[in-house]
């Protein structure tokens, strides 16, 4: 699996961006469904600035996508370089933003934990409300909503590294609705970037994935549920050393 800290150095060289006072490296954090930001805990890397992106995922993907694009316009152009850390439905917001915009953002990679990019079979069910609390957008994040909503292969050539969990999440019974292995909210078909909703036993399974989507660090985290996974990618990438699952 990829060692992303070394990968960051290689990307900076590839972009030929001087990491001086005239340029910045920004680590953009994007939360999940029904959230308005990532939350209180962000990753921190020496010499880089962490951003708690103000993305409102309560009402519509259109609103969230517009706010995501505005965030990238602010931090990821000119001499700046960004790394984008997304959780849950934040993965779908980022994917949709790339697909619907032709802007030349300087993004080294997207790091996705428990991504709902491919939608959840729980979308529009009472289970979403039990797990995350109710919001209007929760009724529109199903597999057909997300998979048919935009071109997931249009990534501007940007890599999305993905990790997934397979742990139990209260109220537990919803896992019967999700195909294959799942973290209690999304299946590994979604969290692994696969092009179909067929059940998967890990995100390393050999099957078609959306362009530039990769499994990073582990084929799955068998004991971690959807909530546990939120900080796992940031921890794996060196942004947190305490409070890691």
Region annotations inferred by a language model:
Residues 2-10:
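Bacterial N-terminal signal peptides that target proteins for export
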Residues 65-157:
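Serine-dependent carboxylesterase/thioesterase catalytic core
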Residues 153-245:
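C-terminal catalytic-base region of ester-bond hydrolases, centering on the histidine
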């Amino acid at each position: 699996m990829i060692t992303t800290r070394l990968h960051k150095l290689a990307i900076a060289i590839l972009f030929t961006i001087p990491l001086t006072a005239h340029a910045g490296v920004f680590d953009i954090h994007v939360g999940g469904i029904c959230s308005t930001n990532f939350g209180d805990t962000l990753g921190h890397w020496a010499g880089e600035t962490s951003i708690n992106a103000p993305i409102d995922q309560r009402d519509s993907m259109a609103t969230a996508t517009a706010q995501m694009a505005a965030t990238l316009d602010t931090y990821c152009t000119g001499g700046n370089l960004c790394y984008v850390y997304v959780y849950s439905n934040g993965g779908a917001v980022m994917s949709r933003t790339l697909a619907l915009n032709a802007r030349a953002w300087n993004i080294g990679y997207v790091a996705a934990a428990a991504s709902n990019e491919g939608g959840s079979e729980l979308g529009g069910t009472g289970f979403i409300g039990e797990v995350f609390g109710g919001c209007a957008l929760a009724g529109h994040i199903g597999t057909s909503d997300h998979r048919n909503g935009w071109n997931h292969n249009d990534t501007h050539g940007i890599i999305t590294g993905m990790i997934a969990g397979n742990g139990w999440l209260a109220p537990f019974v919803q896992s019967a609705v999700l195909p294959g292995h799942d973290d209690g909210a999304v299946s590994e078909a979604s969290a692994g970037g696969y092009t179909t909703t067929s059940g998967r036993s890990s995100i390393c399974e050999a099957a078609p994935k959306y362009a530039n989507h990769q499994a990073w660090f582990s084929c799955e985290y068998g004991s971690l549920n959807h909530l546990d996974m939120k900080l796992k990618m940031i921890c794996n990438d060196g942004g947190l050393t305490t409070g890691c699952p």
